[in-house]
């Protein structure tokens, strides 16, 4: 079956993408690793000893980045409804973190600690209908914010991918109510044509 023009364009862009080549060379599972690396270079969210949760972690490139930085004294917990191949130094839980059994398993692993950081690069399966996709995207963002509210220590940080649209301002307002400072980040590895940006909440109240 012949590929569509948009499919061919995506394939050509993928083949020519410097971040795809860098990911292959550096051993990362996806180009998204460089988004987190760039943000972390600027904001120093992940350090040796950091305890964090990676929501929507599959295929695992953000968990790879985090595990390499936190070292033996830190801890990375990864959660996703999809399976993920093991990442050294990462505790992975497969399941929906809204479900009681999944949360219970996570909290047992957490063992009474509070998180320094929650990161979320979650995105829904896109339907191609922008209104539906935006609603699904912000539902994931809201769930991630609730998770951060419940598990971050005072002073902890939250990094989340959002897509700009009608729900953006209310979501930004909700983040500002929970954090001392909220800033936007658009890393170079984020494609120019994408409406995605990252919101970073610093200093959980």
Curated annotation (Swiss-Prot):
It is found in: Cytoplasm. The active site is at residue 161. InterPro entries: RNA_methyltr_RlmE, RNA_MeTrfase_FtsJ_dom, rRNA-MeTfrase_E, SAM-dependent_MTases_sf. The keyword rRNA processing applies. Its main location: cytoplasm. GO terms for molecular function: rRNA (uridine-2'-O-)-methyltransferase activity. Pfam families: FtsJ. GO terms for cellular component: cytoplasm. Its EC number is 2.1.1.166. Keywords: Cytoplasm, Methyltransferase, rRNA processing, S-adenosyl-L-methionine, Transferase. It catalyses: uridine(2552) in 23S rRNA + S-adenosyl-L-methionine = 2'-O-methyluridine(2552) in 23S rRNA + S-adenosyl-L-homocysteine + H(+). S-adenosyl-L-methionine binds at residues 60, 62, 80, 96, 121. Belongs to the class I-like SAM-binding methyltransferase superfamily. RNA methyltransferase RlmE family. Specifically methylates the uridine in position 2552 of 23S rRNA at the 2'-O position of the ribose in the fully assembled 50S ribosomal subunit. PANTHER family: RIBOSOMAL RNA METHYLTRANSFERASE, RRNA METHYLTRANSFERASE 2, MITOCHONDRIAL. This is Ribosomal RNA large subunit methyltransferase E. It comes from Chromobacterium violaceum (strain ATCC 12472 / DSM 30191 / JCM 1249 / CCUG 213 / NBRC 12614 / NCIMB 9131 / NCTC 9757 / MK).
